[in-house]
């Protein structure tokens, strides 16, 4: 039996299979595709080809529900920061980066994909690692990692689409405790109900008010 807490403490990352059952993953995947078709996604600076979503409602509900079980699994007193989803599209590249403070402890989960195989992520062993470990994340599986410490990236996407969900947490007893709930940013729940242009304008206003854009 895997000791997730020990592995996460030692390696600063851990792979958790079946974090969501397939039906739940499909439901969240459907939410992201529906929002995309309604024009409620945005193009961020990090992945301009793809459609991105800050705190989509059903995904955020899943994020909040994850806090208690993940806290027990990792033996860390977590609080949620925010969730972020991307519908990755052909030609996208995720450049090597580490994450901002609100992403101290992060998880990336594949919700669905269309292509020959799932699009892998490369996870470095520290913030300067340029080689990294190639990791294929199955649908409903979760890779947790210290986002502010480990450099991560994805090479050029050759598939048709892939839906990725990111859960971001902070350690209540750590250096970034003040970033709980992403410093209380809460506009997104209502923004997903307005037209696409208003969504994009709200997103631009939000990112301009921060020192950096979301990193995933």
What are these regions (language model features)?
Residues 1-74:
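Non-heme Fe(II)/2-oxoglutarate
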Residues 7-10, 79, 161:
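A short, polar/charged loop/turn motif at coil->beta-strand junctions and beta-hairpin connectors
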Residues 17, 155, 168:
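Residue-level detector of conserved, well-ordered beta-strand and adjacent loop positions
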Residues 51-52, 60-120:
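Conserved double-stranded beta-helix
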Residues 86, 158-159:
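A short beta-turn/loop motif at secondary-structure boundaries
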Residues 90-149, 161-165, 170-185:
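Catalytic core of non-heme Fe(II) oxygenases with the double-stranded beta-helix
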Residues 151-158:
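Short, Lys/Arg- and Gly-enriched loop/turn segments at beta-strand edges
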Residues 161-216:
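Double-stranded beta-helix
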């Amino acid at each position: 039996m895997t000791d997730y807490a020990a592995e996460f403490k030692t390696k600063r990352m851990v792979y958790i299979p079946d974090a969501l059952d397939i039906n739940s993953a499909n439901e969240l995947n459907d939410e992201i595709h529906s929002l995309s078709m309604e024009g409620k996604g945005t193009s961020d600076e990090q992945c301009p080809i793809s459609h991105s979503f800050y705190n989509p409602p059903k995904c955020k509900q899943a994020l909040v529900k994850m806090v208690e079980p993940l806290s027990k699994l990792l033996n860390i007193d977590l609080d949620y920061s925010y969730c972020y989803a991307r519908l990755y599209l052909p030609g996208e590249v995720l450049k090597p980066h580490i994450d901002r403070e609100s992403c101290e402890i992060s998880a990336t989960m594949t919700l669905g994909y269309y292509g020959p195989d799932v699009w892998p992520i490369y996870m470095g062993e520290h913030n300067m690692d340029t080689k990294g470990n190639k990791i294929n994340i199955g649908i409903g599986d979760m890779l947790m990692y210290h986002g502010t410490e480990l450099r991560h990236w994805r090479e050029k996407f050759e598939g048709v689409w892939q839906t990725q969900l990111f859960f971001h947490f902070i350690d209540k007893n750590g250096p970034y405790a003040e970033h709980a709930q992403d410093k209380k940013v809460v506009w997104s729940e209502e923004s997903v109900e307005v037209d696409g242009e208003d969504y994009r304008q709200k997103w631009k206003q939000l990112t301009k008010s921060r020192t950096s854009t979301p990193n995933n």
